[in-house]
A protein has these predicted regions:
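N-terminal alpha-helical interaction modules that lie
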Residues: 1-88, 148, 158-159, 163-167, ...
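Alpha-helical scaffold segments of alpha-solenoid architecture
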Residues: 82-209
Length: 209
């Protein structure tokens, strides 16, 4: 059985090479080793520098797991990884809470909720985030799902569509939800069109959809 260090190195190489299927195979044995070493769920009462360094590595492993799950469209797995990252991201320990992937993964989590049409949980999570992250909408990544939700709620489907078209702001993972959300917009337009018009020419329907 390879050591935790060897498995982690293999995971890093697979992720950098875009081999997300290999990542998914490596992650279960890595998580077993993390559990054995009391690292999967951080004990924030331990202030030992060596332990804190180890849990920082654990955080990066979980982030790789979350991003690999998005790339393989395994959204249930993504949600599990994100929930495991929450104790890190919302820790009072600055070192644990900060990450260059934090905004991206929170945004992906919100997009995942929107794609499930789980607006109740979306707004509940948004309230929580608003208490823990200052000026949410000033963050270009976090503002993406927030604007999308607002425009869908307002019925500003063209704005929402244009945002999805412009898409990803160079964040390829956002595109994992684009088709699902575009389909939701089409369904809403079709439903509203059916309610609004007794008769509508085919050419007009094509323009709306």
């Amino acid at each position: 059985m390879p050591s935790l260090a060897e498995l982690t190195k293999s995971l890093s190489i697979a992720f950098e090479n875009g081999d997300y299927a290999a990542c998914e195979k490596l992650l279960p044995p890595i998580k077993i080793e993390l559990i054995k070493n009391n690292l999967l769920i951080p004990d924030l009462s331990i202030q030992n520098d060596i332990y804190l360094n180890d849990v920082m590595i654990t955080k990066r492993i979980l982030e790789v797991g979350a991003l690999a799950s998005i790339q393989t469209f395994n959204f249930d797995s993504f949600e599990n990884y994100f929930n495991q990252l929450k104790p890190y991201y919302f820790s009072n320990n600055h070192k644990l809470s900060e990450s260059d992937k934090k905004s991206k993964l929170i945004s992906l989590y919100l997009l995942n909720l929107l794609s499930q049409n789980n607006t109740t949980k979306f707004h509940s999570e948004l309230q929580y985030l608003d208490k823990h992250i200052k000026n949410l909408e000033d963050d270009s990544l976090l503002s993406y799902p927030i604007k999308l939700d607002r425009w869908l709620m307002e019925g500003s489907y063209q704005k929402a569509w244009d945002l999805l078209q412009s898409g990803s702001q160079n964040i390829s993972e956002f595109d994992s939800f684009t088709d699902i959300l575009k389909s939701a917009i089409r369904d809403e337009i079709a439903k509203n069109t059916e309610l609004s018009y007794d008769f509508l020419p085919l050419s007009n329907i094509k323009a709306l959809l």
